[in-house]
């Protein structure tokens, strides 16, 4: 039985807080593509996520991108700490070296985003699966990371950490196929009941929060459902999903942290990961309405 819930209010911000109080978000993304005569850099997505996380109130952002992109990332998001991820001669990530770099630099992380601009290679998949197997804080699985997860061997898809998946309908169907859930392909676009049913099934199968993006975004944690009627077609543009992922991670870092409980009596109760995601969706949608 799924309980429909209202979006929670934004928790009070600790007036005595500092940048360490409000959590650290790590963004893992970006990739190098193309060929030597026409190189292609995929850097905008993770940088948008990083800027959104900061604007949504987290104290610190760490931006982990392929080493050749690191100087550009610093220019685009000077507030962030940038980690250059080792790559081979072809520009592909080196998973073991990436793991060492992340382990050394992200010990204080309160939430991760992985996927924006990451690419779909086997090295990126290995980085994703290792992160999911070795972290205890929320991970927002976005963009390319959703496809990588859907393609991974079933044994590797047993989540060991709390996670939020942020699929659009096409990615949601890809996830369902990878998980061998029986659905009618191509049926959920514009069909609220079908979208709701698939969102619920994915959340329950994965034991994760599913944020099904689209007109009337749905959020489900397997027991509770949130939705919004806000937002408009201004969100139908490249980068808006990267921004949402950053906001979700920022709220998870601020309001779902273990040490949030210590401040609860004086300021506000911590949120569940589903509540933090629903609140992020509402803020994202209201921002679009403000611009319309």
Predicted regions and their residues:
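Small-residue (G/A/S/T)-rich helix-start motifs and N-terminal tracts that mark the onset
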Residues: 1-138, 147-164, 169-292
């Amino acid at each position: 039985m799924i309980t429909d819930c209202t979006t929670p209010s934004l928790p009070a911000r600790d007036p005595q807080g500092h940048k360490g109080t409000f959590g650290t978000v790590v963004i893992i993304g970006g990739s190098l593509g193309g060929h030597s005569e026409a190189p292609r850099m995929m850097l905008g997505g993770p940088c948008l996520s990083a800027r959104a996380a900061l604007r949504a109130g987290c104290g610190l952002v760490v931006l982990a991108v392929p080493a050749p992109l690191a100087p550009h990332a610093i220019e685009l998001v000077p507030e962030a700490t940038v980690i250059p991820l080792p790559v081979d001669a072809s520009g592909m990530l080196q998973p073991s070296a990436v793991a060492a770099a992340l382990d050394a630099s992200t010990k204080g992380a309160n939430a991760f985003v992985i996927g924006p601009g990451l690419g779909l290679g086997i090295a990126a998949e290995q980085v994703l699966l290792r992160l999911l197997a070795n972290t205890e804080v929320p991970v927002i699985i976005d963009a390319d990371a959703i496809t990588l997860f859907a393609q991974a061997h079933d044994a590797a898809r047993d989540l060991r950490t709390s996670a939020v998946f942020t699929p659009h309908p096409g990615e949601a169907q890809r996830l369902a196929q990878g998980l061998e859930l029986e659905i009618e392909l191509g049926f959920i676009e514009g069909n609220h009941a079908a979208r709701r049913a698939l969102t619920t099934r994915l959340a329950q199968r994965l034991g994760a929060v599913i944020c099904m993006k689209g007109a009337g975004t749905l959020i489900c944690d397997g027991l509770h459902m949130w939705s919004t009627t806000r937002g408009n077609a201004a969100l139908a543009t490249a980068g808006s999903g990267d921004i949402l992922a950053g906001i979700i991670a920022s709220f998870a870092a601020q309001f779902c942290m273990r040490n949030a409980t210590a401040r609860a009596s004086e300021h506000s109760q911590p949120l569940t990961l589903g509540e933090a995601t629903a609140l992020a969706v509402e803020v994202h949608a209201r921002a679009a309405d403000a611009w319309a």
